[in-house]
Amino acid sequence: MAKILVVDDSRTSRKILKGLLEENGHEVIAEAVKGDDGYLKYKELHPDIVTMDITMPVTDGIQALQLIKHENEKARVIMITAAGQKEKMIQAVKYGADEFITKPFDKEEVVKAINKIVESL
């Protein structure tokens, strides 16, 4: 079981992710709707894994990823992005993202990405 922080400005995406993760035995310890809030919750709670939407208001997922990796270079972050954002995905790899999931996401893909990281913890 992993402790997971879900960062996404879409209430629907957060709800789906939370339900899916909990169904698979993981604990969603917090949610955030903006990247800067996600970063602050990361610093406070130190989750095992962060799922991070790329496109969010104020501080986007790429900026939040950089902040989290600056705080802890070993942080495990799964980026979630809309299809067609190849340049954003390249940036996220540059800044240390562990996995990518494309919206609309396939539930099995999410579980596979989480389990891959859990196995390496």
Range-by-range predicted roles:
Residues A83-G84:
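Short, conserved "switch-loop" micro-motifs in signal-transduction and mechanochemical regulators
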Residues R11-A30, I117:
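Two-component/phosphorelay signaling modules centered on CheY-like receiver
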Residues K34-D37, D60-Q63:
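Acidic catalytic/metal-coordinating carboxylates
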Residues F105-I114:
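C-terminal output helix
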